[in-house]
Amino acid sequence: MAIILGIDPGSRLTGYGVIEQRGRQLNYLGSGCIKVIGTTKEPLTLAEKLRRIHDSVSELITQFKPNEFAIEQVFMAKNPDSALKLGQARGAAIVAAACAELPVAEYSARQIKQSVVGNGGAEKSQVQHMVMALLNLQRCPQEDAADALAVALCHAHSSQNLIKMAGAARKTVRGRLR
């Protein structure tokens, strides 16, 4: 059994999704968004935003007790400043996982969409639909939470494939599968 915490990092909203994997069965445990937005009068500094992401992810780890952690990789944004902030948000979440001694897996947006929808160029609405279908959800989660659940699902699918390959390798005798 694995409990997987998936993270969709962001400098304003960081999505999280937690699933349980028992063999081929996937169960929804929780999802939501970490809001790192201050007020108009008192905006948060970058350091405060990063601390809030780190502390919130640490709390999620304490609450759900995952044994695996997966996060979306940084994509090259048109605005280099946005890509840097996204990378820093990822770093804050990864440090929280590292402090809890969780293995960290990283997936590109294309890998996640391919794994969940079957099309690496899928639209966000398609990802949300498949997340709902795969986890038997009655309501559509927030966009960032759905993306984080997709990260967790991608990791679950990847680990299932690795287990299959490892099992097949053990069954190989002189180049033949049994």
Swiss-Prot record:
One of its GO terms (biological process) is DNA repair. GO terms for molecular function: crossover junction DNA endonuclease activity; DNA binding; magnesium ion binding. It catalyses: Endonucleolytic cleavage at a junction such as a reciprocal single-stranded crossover between two homologous DNA duplexes (Holliday junction). Its main location: cytoplasm. The keyword DNA repair applies. Its EC number is 3.1.21.10. Mg(2+) 2 binds at residue 72. It is found in: Cytoplasm. Keywords: Cytoplasm, DNA damage, DNA recombination, DNA repair, DNA-binding, Endonuclease, Hydrolase, Magnesium, Metal-binding, Nuclease. Mg(2+) 1 binds at residues 8, 144. Its cofactor is Mg(2+). Binds 2 Mg(2+) ion per subunit. The active site is at 8, 72, 144. The RuvA-RuvB-RuvC complex processes Holliday junction (HJ) DNA during genetic recombination and DNA repair. Endonuclease that resolves HJ intermediates. Cleaves cruciform DNA by making single-stranded nicks across the HJ at symmetrical positions within the homologous arms, yielding a 5'-phosphate and a 3'-hydroxyl group; requires a central core of homology in the junction. The consensus cleavage sequence is 5'-(A/T)TT(C/G)-3'. Cleavage occurs on the 3'-side of the TT dinucleotide at the point of strand exchange. This is Crossover junction endodeoxyribonuclease RuvC. It comes from Idiomarina loihiensis (strain ATCC BAA-735 / DSM 15497 / L2-TR). The lineage of its organism: Bacteria, Pseudomonadati, Pseudomonadota, Gammaproteobacteria, Alteromonadales.
